[in-house]
Amino acid sequence: MNTSIKSTHFIKILFFYSSIVFCQSFKHSVVMPVPDLSFHPSVFYGLDVLEQMDFKPMYDKSVGVFTNQTAVNRKGHHLLDILKNHSKVKVEVIFTPQYGLFTQQDKRFKMKDGEKYDPDHGARIVEVFGRNMKPPAWSIRDLDLILIDIQDTGVRFSTYISTMTKILEVASEWSLPVIILDRPNPLRGDRVDGPIIRSKFQSFEGYHIVPIRHGLTIGELAIMANEMGWIKDLKRANLTIIPMANWKRSYWLDKSEHPWINPHPSIKSIRTNLSFSGFGLLEGTNLNDGKGTDKPYLIAGAPWLSGYHLADKLSKLKLPGIKILPVEYIPRMKQTDQSPPLYVDELCSGVEIQIIDPNLYDPLATAT
């Protein structure tokens, strides 16, 4: 009986994946019609599309914004900088994810009465990671809607998508509309890899029942959570997605003209992001995953390991798309680190992954 239930749930997930890819309509979520931009060669993200609409869905509304440093348009202008010059939109609260608004070294915010606020908008800054895993009631009771614009990593254990779903949970409790500005899956939308997490192992870093490399955009993942009943107590949010224009599922993130903005202090390139989908699994093991170096998720090692022996063994496997080299390194504490890396200040021996062809590289197979 349990096997049957699990099989049925898995079939529902597969069916929903196909419905997203083929753009079927949804019962509880809306994908907003957008202007036809097919004449233009560039990819337009949700923020770019909303700009083309002059932010009309937000006119004369008090808005809470969930965002970080990644919310930039095609010209590199940040969402909050664009909105501060818009007379018909009032940003009341800024919700920030893990690592903060503009990372932990953010100099933009000010302190007033012991609380953070953004001086450009006069808006409170509320962290929704750590002590508050979702927006507290006082922060949303006077809002008209919540706007979400954040670049995800395309990997299940990203906390950004977990926080997004917790925001949908709070919004459903308060009947508060949510608008999500869609952004690409950086690792292509046509590649899916890794197992679906078992429900008994779910956590904040494994919140959604999707593969490790899930192939969904952040908007698609929000629709999935809303339609599949993954919000607490099977509630549904009043969810609207402003989609992208001209994006294709076969695109890597660097295919667009948008500037690369690190989505995570340790993810500084699309190749690091790709490797994160495999080497991120090393967190919690007795291997350092490259944190504390300038090549996180591209090297792995430990003081007790022989990198030369391991590199020789792995090279014989002829793993596609990569070259494996022995390496020695010393992890150091960095300003952006929230905690010391494993084996900080110790000499580690291990391997380095040099990505030759990202289309052939299988991070999960390599890491496991």
Residue map of PLM features:
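N-terminal phosphate-binding or glycine-rich loops at protein starts, especially the Walker A/P-loop
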Residues: S42-V89
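Conserved functional hotspot residues or short segments at active or partner-binding sites
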Residues: A300-T368
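Short internal beta-strands
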Residues: K90-Q98, L181
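Glycine/threonine-rich flexible loop motifs
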Residues: D152-M164
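Glycine-rich, charge-decorated loop segments at or immediately adjacent to ligand/cofactor-binding or catalytic sites
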Residues: T103-K107, I179-F201
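Glycine-rich oxoanion-binding loops at beta->alpha junctions
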Residues: K107, M111-L143, V155
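Conserved anion/nucleotide-ligand pocket segment
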Residues: Q202-F276
